[in-house]
Each structure stands twice: as structure tokens, then as C-alpha cells.
């Protein structure tokens, strides 16, 4: 269904796609595309600078600013349509309480998360509903929660959330997730909620997130 098809997959190393000549919108201009699997961002940069890589995803404001100033590179802003979100575990007794969930939402500041974890809205934008702002079905009329610490404290106290310690897991291979978790941790401290944060690789994170909760 796309302009390329899988030619070779080397686990943990690379995926090679070759052109699919029968693509209904016509042949692609490239014969093949090789995607290198490089979890280490320093290795990515070294490969880009040596010419081993033609394209690299930039996930930090510092690197974005650096490459924008360097005439040897061209920076493209391509919306991913990806949505990063906080999911509540409804099997947890405290998370079954709607006021506890509201308290958490009211304690968070999306703008601070974007600024602290990404650097600016050049790399991420706050989403106020369950679609990214680039999605066709994004609803501008939905405003989401606005940070209100005093109201969050009241709800946290009345729901029994105050003084609790919550366990927060994140996918550690995905950029900016650790920084996001740390900012959320600091914001929840303002309403007397402690957060234990734990990064997991894919083999642990996804089974824990989906299979373990069902």
C-alpha cells in the first residue's frame, strides 16, 4: 500500500526498504531507504556528521538550534501526529476515584512540560484532547484542564490522594519521556502527591502497560 516494501530486517541494527514499483501513485524517486536503529543519540549525531546518515530526528531544543545555525544542514519541521499522554490505571483503588484523577489533571501545567522536556513548541505542542493538533479530528473547542493548584489540593485531600505515593512508568527508549516524568513529579509535589518514576525498555513497558492491566 506504500511506495516501499521491506527488503531486509536486521534485529537491533536496521530495516532496509526497497522501492515498490507498482505503487498506485507512481514510483518513488529513491531506490531504497535504510533505517538505522541507534538508541544512543550521540551515536546518531556522529553518524550524521560523518555522512553515514542522511537524515536524523532532532528531539532537543539545543540540537535544533545548533543545526538551524549550521549551513551544512537543512532543518525540516514535519509534524508527527504523535500524542504523548498520561494514562491512569483504573485497577488502582485511588485511580478509580474521579476527583483523584481530576486533582492530578489540575496540578499539571502543559506549557511547563513542553518547555522543560522539549524546549519549545517547535518540538511539541500541548494537546487539549485525545488527538494531536495536526490530526484531522482535533477539536479546537475543547480546552482541557488549566492548572489550578488550589482546586487540585482540595480534590486531592477530599479524595484521599494527598500524601499518597504513585508509581509512574515511562518508555525509556522514547526521547523526552524521562524529562516529562521528572516535571510531572515536581508538579504533583505541589499538591502533596509523591511520584516514583521508573523507565522501562519496550520488552517490559508494553506488556506492563497493556497485558498486565487487562
Regions flagged by a language model, labelled:
Residues 1-28, 32, 150:
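Gly/Pro-rich hinge or "lid" segments in bacterial periplasmic/extracellular proteins
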Residues 20-66, 194:
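Ligand-site clamp/hinge motif
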Residues 74-88, 91, 95-134, 179:
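Periplasmic-binding protein-like
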Residues 4, 124-158, 174-177:
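Structural transition elements
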Residues 65-77, 212-214:
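Ligand-binding "clamshell"
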Amino acid at each position: 500500500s506504500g511506495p516501499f516494501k521491506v527488503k531486509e530486517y536486521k534485529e537491533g541494527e536496521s530495516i532496509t526498504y526497497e522501492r515498490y514499483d507498482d505503487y498506485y501513485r507512481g514510483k518513488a524517486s529513491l531506490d531504497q531507504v535504510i533505517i538505522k536503529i541507534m538508541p544512543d543519540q550521540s551515536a546518531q549525531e556522529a553518524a550524521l556528521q560523518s555522512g553515514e546518515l542522511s537524515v536524523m530526528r532532532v528531539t532537543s531544543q539545543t540540537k535544533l538550534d545548533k543545526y538551524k545555525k549550521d549551513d551544512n544542514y537543512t532543518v525540516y519541521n514535519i509534524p508527527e501526529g504523535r500524542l504523548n499522554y498520561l494514562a491512569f490505571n483504573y485497577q488502582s483503588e485511588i485511580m478509580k476515584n474521579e476527583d483523584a484523577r481530576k486533582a492530578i489533571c489540575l496540578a499539571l501545567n502543559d506549557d511547563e512540560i513542553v518547555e522543560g522536556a522539549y524546549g519549545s513548541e517547535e518540538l511539541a505542542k500541548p494537546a487539549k484532547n485525545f488527538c494531536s493538533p495536526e490530526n484531522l479530528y482535533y477539536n479546537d473547542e475543547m480546552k482541557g484542564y488549566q492548572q489550578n493548584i488550589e482546586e487540585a489540593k482540595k480534590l486531592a485531600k477530599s479524595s484521599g490522594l494527598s500524601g499518597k505515593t504513585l508509581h509512574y512508568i515511562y518508555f525509556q527508549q522514547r526521547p523526552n519521556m524521562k524529562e516529562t516524568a521528572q516535571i510531572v513529579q515536581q508538579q504533583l509535589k505541589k499538591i502533596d502527591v509523591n511520584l516514583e518514576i521508573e523507565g522501562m525498555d519496550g520488552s517490559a513497558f508494553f506488556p506492563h502497560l497493556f497485558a498486565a492491566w487487562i
